[in-house]
Amino acid sequence: MKHIPNIITCIRILLIPVFCYYLWNDCAIAAGIVFIAASLSDILDGYLSRKLNAVSNFGKLADPFADKVMQISAIILLVLLGRMSAWIMIVMFIKDFILIAGGLLIKFIYKITVTSRWFGKISAFYLNAVLAAGILFSLNKNIIDILMIIAVVMQIITLIGYTTLSLK
Protein backbone atom coordinates (compact mmCIF):
# COMPACT_ATOMS: atom_id res chain seq x y z
CA MET A 1 0.00 0.00 0.00
CA LYS A 2 2.84 2.40 0.78
CA HIS A 3 4.12 2.22 -2.80
CA ILE A 4 0.82 3.31 -4.38
CA PRO A 5 1.65 7.06 -4.39
CA ASN A 6 5.00 6.39 -6.10
CA ILE A 7 3.35 4.10 -8.64
CA ILE A 8 0.85 6.87 -9.45
CA THR A 9 3.74 9.33 -9.87
CA CYS A 10 5.53 6.88 -12.21
CA ILE A 11 2.36 6.49 -14.27
CA ARG A 12 2.13 10.28 -14.48
CA ILE A 13 5.70 10.41 -15.81
CA LEU A 14 4.81 7.73 -18.39
CA LEU A 15 1.80 9.81 -19.48
CA ILE A 16 4.00 12.75 -20.53
CA PRO A 17 5.03 11.34 -23.95
CA VAL A 18 1.44 10.17 -24.53
CA PHE A 19 0.22 13.69 -23.82
CA CYS A 20 2.88 15.18 -26.12
CA TYR A 21 1.96 12.79 -28.94
CA TYR A 22 -1.73 13.67 -28.75
CA LEU A 23 -1.19 17.42 -28.51
CA TRP A 24 1.39 17.51 -31.32
CA ASN A 25 -0.90 15.44 -33.56
CA ASP A 26 -3.84 17.80 -32.98
CA CYS A 27 -5.87 15.43 -30.82
CA ALA A 28 -6.89 18.16 -28.37
CA ILE A 29 -9.54 16.15 -26.52
CA ALA A 30 -7.22 13.17 -25.93
CA ALA A 31 -4.34 15.48 -24.94
CA GLY A 32 -6.63 17.41 -22.60
CA ILE A 33 -7.92 14.23 -20.97
CA VAL A 34 -4.37 12.95 -20.40
CA PHE A 35 -3.25 16.35 -19.05
CA ILE A 36 -6.22 16.62 -16.67
CA ALA A 37 -5.85 12.98 -15.57
CA ALA A 38 -2.17 13.61 -14.81
CA SER A 39 -3.05 16.78 -12.87
CA LEU A 40 -5.71 14.97 -10.85
CA SER A 41 -3.37 12.05 -10.19
CA ASP A 42 -0.95 14.54 -8.64
CA ILE A 43 -3.64 15.49 -6.13
CA LEU A 44 -4.41 11.81 -5.52
CA ASP A 45 -0.82 10.69 -4.95
CA GLY A 46 -0.21 13.61 -2.56
CA TYR A 47 -3.33 12.75 -0.59
CA LEU A 48 -2.47 9.04 -0.48
CA SER A 49 1.13 9.61 0.54
CA ARG A 50 -0.05 11.62 3.54
CA LYS A 51 -3.02 9.35 4.36
CA LEU A 52 -0.95 6.15 4.11
CA ASN A 53 2.05 7.74 5.81
CA ALA A 54 3.98 6.85 2.67
CA VAL A 55 5.99 10.02 2.07
CA SER A 56 9.28 8.91 0.49
CA ASN A 57 12.48 10.52 -0.76
CA PHE A 58 11.66 9.18 -4.23
CA GLY A 59 8.24 10.81 -4.12
CA LYS A 60 9.68 14.10 -2.88
CA LEU A 61 11.81 14.25 -6.03
CA ALA A 62 9.70 12.41 -8.62
CA ASP A 63 6.41 14.16 -7.86
CA PRO A 64 7.55 17.75 -8.54
CA PHE A 65 9.66 16.45 -11.45
CA ALA A 66 6.57 14.90 -13.07
CA ASP A 67 4.58 18.10 -12.51
CA LYS A 68 7.24 20.38 -13.99
CA VAL A 69 7.99 18.16 -17.00
CA MET A 70 4.27 17.92 -17.83
CA GLN A 71 3.82 21.69 -17.49
CA ILE A 72 6.98 22.48 -19.47
CA SER A 73 5.94 20.02 -22.19
CA ALA A 74 2.53 21.67 -22.45
CA ILE A 75 4.04 25.16 -22.60
CA ILE A 76 6.63 24.24 -25.24
CA LEU A 77 4.05 22.50 -27.42
CA LEU A 78 1.54 25.34 -27.09
CA VAL A 79 4.27 27.75 -28.24
CA LEU A 80 5.32 25.47 -31.12
CA LEU A 81 1.69 25.12 -32.16
CA GLY A 82 1.31 28.91 -32.17
CA ARG A 83 -1.21 29.01 -29.32
CA MET A 84 1.02 30.87 -26.86
CA SER A 85 3.73 33.52 -27.18
CA ALA A 86 7.35 32.41 -26.80
CA TRP A 87 8.15 35.20 -24.35
CA ILE A 88 5.66 33.69 -21.87
CA MET A 89 7.56 30.40 -22.12
CA ILE A 90 10.87 32.19 -21.51
CA VAL A 91 9.51 34.00 -18.44
CA MET A 92 8.13 30.71 -17.06
CA PHE A 93 11.48 28.98 -17.61
CA ILE A 94 13.37 31.79 -15.86
CA LYS A 95 10.91 31.64 -12.95
CA ASP A 96 11.30 27.85 -12.71
CA PHE A 97 15.10 28.14 -12.82
CA ILE A 98 15.04 30.70 -10.00
CA LEU A 99 12.62 28.52 -8.01
CA ILE A 100 14.75 25.38 -8.40
CA ALA A 101 18.08 27.16 -7.83
CA GLY A 102 16.67 29.03 -4.82
CA GLY A 103 15.22 25.86 -3.37
CA LEU A 104 18.55 24.07 -3.72
CA LEU A 105 20.44 26.99 -2.16
CA ILE A 106 18.05 27.13 0.78
CA LYS A 107 18.33 23.37 1.21
CA PHE A 108 22.13 23.25 1.11
CA ILE A 109 22.99 26.54 2.85
CA TYR A 110 20.26 26.67 5.49
CA LYS A 111 19.52 22.92 5.63
CA ILE A 112 15.81 23.68 5.15
CA THR A 113 13.50 21.68 2.90
CA VAL A 114 10.78 23.87 1.43
CA THR A 115 7.40 22.15 1.60
CA SER A 116 4.27 22.88 -0.38
CA ARG A 117 1.98 25.62 0.94
CA TRP A 118 -1.60 26.63 0.10
CA PHE A 119 -0.52 29.56 -2.10
CA GLY A 120 1.75 27.28 -4.12
CA LYS A 121 -1.09 24.82 -4.60
CA ILE A 122 -3.46 27.58 -5.74
CA SER A 123 -0.98 28.96 -8.28
CA ALA A 124 -0.19 25.44 -9.55
CA PHE A 125 -3.91 24.70 -9.90
CA TYR A 126 -4.46 27.94 -11.81
CA LEU A 127 -1.50 27.25 -14.12
CA ASN A 128 -2.77 23.73 -14.85
CA ALA A 129 -6.29 25.08 -15.47
CA VAL A 130 -4.96 27.65 -17.96
CA LEU A 131 -2.84 25.01 -19.70
CA ALA A 132 -5.82 22.63 -19.85
CA ALA A 133 -7.95 25.40 -21.38
CA GLY A 134 -5.20 26.15 -23.89
CA ILE A 135 -5.02 22.47 -24.81
CA LEU A 136 -8.75 21.76 -25.00
CA PHE A 137 -10.20 24.93 -26.46
CA SER A 138 -9.33 27.00 -29.48
CA LEU A 139 -8.76 30.10 -27.41
CA ASN A 140 -7.29 33.15 -29.06
CA LYS A 141 -3.51 33.33 -28.51
CA ASN A 142 -3.92 36.73 -26.82
CA ILE A 143 -6.41 35.28 -24.32
CA ILE A 144 -4.05 32.44 -23.43
CA ASP A 145 -1.21 34.95 -23.10
CA ILE A 146 -3.25 37.12 -20.72
CA LEU A 147 -4.23 34.09 -18.63
CA MET A 148 -0.59 32.98 -18.59
CA ILE A 149 0.54 36.46 -17.49
CA ILE A 150 -1.80 36.07 -14.51
CA ALA A 151 -0.24 32.62 -13.91
CA VAL A 152 3.26 34.14 -14.07
CA VAL A 153 2.30 36.85 -11.56
CA MET A 154 0.80 34.21 -9.26
CA GLN A 155 3.94 32.08 -9.60
CA ILE A 156 6.19 35.06 -8.80
CA ILE A 157 4.09 35.88 -5.72
CA THR A 158 4.38 32.22 -4.75
CA LEU A 159 8.16 32.35 -5.24
CA ILE A 160 8.35 35.41 -2.98
CA GLY A 161 6.12 33.68 -0.41
CA TYR A 162 8.28 30.56 -0.33
CA THR A 163 11.46 32.64 -0.10
CA THR A 164 10.06 34.71 2.77
CA LEU A 165 8.92 31.63 4.69
CA SER A 166 12.20 29.80 4.11
CA LEU A 167 14.35 32.64 5.38
CA LYS A 168 12.38 33.18 8.63
How would you label these PLM feature ranges?
Residues 1-168:
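Alpha-helical transmembrane bundles and membrane-interface segments of multipass inner-membrane proteins
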